[in-house]
UniProtKB/Swiss-Prot annotation:
Key word Manganese present: no
Similarity annotation: Belongs to the polyphosphate kinase 1 (PPK1) family.
Cited PANTHER family: POLYPHOSPHATE KINASE
Stated name of the protein: Polyphosphate kinase
Catalytic residue positions: H435
NCBIfam families for this protein: poly_P_kin (TIGR03705), PRK05443.1-1 (NF003917), PRK05443.1-2 (NF003918), PRK05443.2-2 (NF003921)
InterPro entries: PP_kinase (IPR003414), PP_kinase_C_1 (IPR041108), PP_kinase_middle (IPR024953), PP_kinase_middle_dom_sf (IPR036830), PPK_C_dom2 (IPR025200), PPK_N_dom (IPR025198), PPK_N_dom_sf (IPR036832)
Amino acid sequence: MSVRYPLLNRELGILGFNERVLAQAADPQVPLLERLRFICITSSNLDEFFEVRMAGLQEQIRDNPGALTPDGMSLQHAYDLVVERAQRLVHRQYTMLHETVLPALEQEGIYFHAADTWNDEQLEWARRYFLDELLPVLTPIGLDPAHPFPRVLNKSLNFVVELEGRDAFGRQAVMGIVQAPRALPRVVRMPQALSGFEHGFVLLSTFMQRFVGELFPQLVVKSCNQFRITRNSELFVDEDEITNLRVALQGELPARHLGNAVRLEVSADTPAHIVRRLLEESLLDEKDCYRVAGSVNLVRLMQIPDLVDRPDLKFAPFTASIPPVIANAPAMFDAIDDGDILLHHPYESFQPVLELLQQAAKDPSVVAIKQTIYRTGTDSPLMDALMAAARNGKEVTVVVELLARFDEETNINWASQLEAVGAHVVYGVVGHKCHAKMMLIVRRVVEGGKATLRRYVHLGTGNYHPRTARLYTDFGLMTADQKICEDVHHVFQQLTGIGGELTLHELWQSPFTLHPRIIESIRAEIDNARAGKRARVVAKMNALLEPTVIAALYEASQAGVKVDLIVRGVCALKPGVPGLSENITVRSIVGRFLEHHRIYYFHADGAEEVYLSSADWMDRNLFRRVEVAFPIRERKLKRRVIAEGLSVCLGDNQSAWLMQSDGHYRRRRAGKTLRNAQLGLLAKFCS
């Protein structure tokens, strides 16, 4: 593709975001156990990065090696740059863990016991634990012509054991593989009386390396090293050929664990000839091998903060508030009848959203409920309420997105449970993921002595997921505005039925009007700037990649429009380039909570148009998904969105990172007054 305007590389941008996440682990202002958690989050993010983005790059290189990336690099050059940066990031991650975080944890009485530090009593306890709890579950595989190298599961923990001697059949033993079943605990607590520390732990890998000889009796163990293979986890479902998406997906899910290898992780002391064998068996190159000083899966350390009762080493707990208009109302419908309600999570509770649905399930006046589900978790009170509504005779329709990445199995299970109680379940539109967050409740009310149907709607920027609603920043709107409700009704009709494109009056919807409306709104600011009027665009999102939107923003900058972008993750736009984007700033907020809301602000000659949305400015959101953006019209709520969603981020000088024109980020230096967006909102709303 020819690049008219400069773009930054997507994969490098994703790694840049993870560098900012990892920087939280180095921040002494962050509580110690939370610093460990940020290291684990970085590992989890990198796993998905390799499963999806790096796997995609490898496939493109194989299929079309001469192609260019959207930013104009050759695929191979881009891949080499990404690998180099990923290797540096992983090295920094493990260095931070071993040189900073683990020593600090030890000072606080939280210790990971290595086998070479065990005394006799600890050794005996560890031996008994291995023999009683681990050995019965483990299956050693000796490698010979009758036992080929196993195809290890995606991201599973494995041990390669170098052996010497002959087995019971007289075969020369050379190498064995032991796969650790996912059911085995990766972290085991040592009894405090034995440990000598308030919280002593032993890693599964430590048990294995010390006692693996029990699995290969009468053989000499020369070495035992852990390794992990990351595989391509994209599911392939031919949506043009299938007749039942759920059945097709159920057939494809098991293959996810056995896709092509994209990364090999090995412990740093693994012998070179063993590494070569693992690479050969995985069909990987040396550059795809990541040698790590410690556990090959740091994600499993995520449980440590939950196992350690040390509130002083964690973020202070908070109680999300409930708006007085809700707390003082007899029921949720009464509160919404009094006017639109804006909820700002996690500072304001997600509970009113659940209560709206729970009350609707029991209310005899409610005749129908329609709901979209993208991610909701395995244990969801929201889904329980939908099933209760169906059992109570309500007309319940749920649009379940089966292709929500890594939540496919959960959503299949929910779809089955919903159908079992009589709910109508549809899977959206083939070829377009349904990412919109919508709830529609139809209620029979009496107005002026006459029975009529009244609609109530909840629209959000984030998922209907109670757990992540305490971890992600999102806005939600509850309204009975009949224009918005009518639009939501039409979108649901479109998702569940078959028909032509609908005319919506208030909502912007992808893949139809969302992208054109964004471009039109930016161009209106350009026209105002050229006419000598004040012009401004402020947008907050997770990612900015779509080339035509970026081109429009460049043109806006050249016309004199002030553009402030708050992009948490990857941003392909280059800010601050003279003659191109000197009027554009890009910042990323990384803190306790995951910044997740999407906000579009256009000055509009003083009218100040504000839209909330589930959509980032990416190709997939604007063209290959069903998304909605909804306006905030009520003046007080609009001021809140601007103040709480945009202004606090633009003023943040503690957790903000400013993007430079070369794509790198630097922390915004604190001024005389320290301003932290998330801490300020916690202080304002929470107790």
